[in-house]
Amino acid sequence: MSANLKYLSLGILVFQTTSLVLTMRYSRTLKEEGPRYLSSTAVVVAELLKIMACILLVYKDSKCSLRALNRILHDEILNKPMETLKLAIPSGIYTLQNNLLYVALSNLDAATYQVTYQLKILTTALFSVSMLSKKLGVYQWLSLVILMTGVAFVQWPSDSQELNSKELSAGSQFVGLMAVLTACFSSGFAGVYFEKILKETKQSVWIRNIQLGFFGSIFGLMGVYVYDGELVSKNGFFQGYNRLTWIVVVLQALGGLVIAAVIKYADNILKGFATSLSIILSTLISYFWLQDFVPTSVFFLGAILVITATFLYGYDPKPAGNPTKA
């Protein structure tokens, strides 16, 4: 049963990651009549959906009892204001990160984005060393060097980029790259900060996600007011929303829940395998379906290095199955 859950969670992760990147990219480049949907509002809606999903999961864990659900939410959130406030910092950073991903995929093709975004492995590792005093092995340090080399190859200018010059200017690609790099740093810091909180307390990951979603909604609404307030007052909060937009929002809302399931049922090596599959699928679909990406030999070399680094970082050279003596 656990093996089935392991591969099911990884399969869902591949589907969710690939689908989110491709649909978000397509939705931001699709030319339609009327105003385009506002990414700031999509981030808020995704946070609200995540809260609803987590409440349902807590309800399930409390044996489908509304009374038990109400008691848990009251005891774990309202009665522990300081514990809840701890999530304000990572929540604000995650909200910034989610907005940056929309900026990145508005300016970069899905394949380039997918590979470059794996730099979050590097930032997560560095923040883990500094904040959690985590020690990295030789294989992990080597994988980080390979990762940086691979991403550098992926971002290496090539003649094939001239084919996309009508769609993407050098300026917009620079904006996309800066958005991805900033998202990598924010993802690394927020992820390690969240891990530190989870390890220091006994609250469930679903309660913590509800707290994250609560602050995320507040920060997201502040972003809507500051950056898109005029457009919202003119055309409405849900301007430009269509079926594709809702698919993007739902996929983004499910992202954190899928990661939680993978952490629970799988391991780093299989998670790396899922990430690698997602990169390959994104590359193929970007080339054959979206037709906004022409892979080069340099890109393939970089992608192979990134995939290798992903596996190597999760590799444990210690033999498994030897029980420790008491």
Curated annotation (Swiss-Prot):
Residues annotated as transmembrane: 4-24, 38-58, 136-156, 174-194, 212-232, 244-264, 269-289, 293-313
A GO term for molecular function: antiporter activity
GO cellular component terms, semicolon-separated: Golgi membrane
Gene Ontology BP annotations: transmembrane transport; UDP-N-acetylglucosamine transmembrane transport
Pfam family, one: Nuc_sug_transp
Modification after translation, per record: O-Glcnacylation regulates the stability of SLC35A3 and the specific complex formation with MGAT4B.
Bilayer topology: Multi-pass membrane protein
Catalytic function, reaction form: UMP(out) + UDP-N-acetyl-alpha-D-glucosamine(in) = UMP(in) + UDP-N-acetyl-alpha-D-glucosamine(out)
Location of the protein in the cell: Golgi apparatus membrane
Cysteine disulfide partners in this protein: none
Alphabetically ordered keywords of this record: Antiport, Disease variant, Golgi apparatus, Membrane, Sugar transport, Transmembrane, Transmembrane helix, Transport
Record function comment: Transports diphosphate-N-acetylglucosamine (UDP-GlcNAc) from the cytosol into the lumen of the Golgi apparatus, functioning as an antiporter that exchanges UDP-N-acetyl-alpha-D-glucosamine for UMP. May supply UDP-GlcNAc as substrate for Golgi-resident glycosyltransferases that generate highly branched, multiantennary complex N-glycans and keratan sulfate. However, the exact role of SLC35A3 still needs to be elucidated, it could be a member of a catalytically more efficient multiprotein complex rather than function independently as a single transporter.
Family: Belongs to the nucleotide-sugar transporter family. SLC35A subfamily.
Quaternary data: Interacts with SLC35A2; the interaction is reduced in the presence of SLC35A4. Found in a complex with SLC35A2 and SLC35A4. Interacts with MGAT4B.
Record disease entry: Defects in SLC35A3 may be cause of complex vertebral malformation (CVM) in Holstein.
Protein name: UDP-N-acetylglucosamine transporter
Source organism: Bos taurus (Bovine)
Name of the gene encoding the protein in the UniProt record: SLC35A3
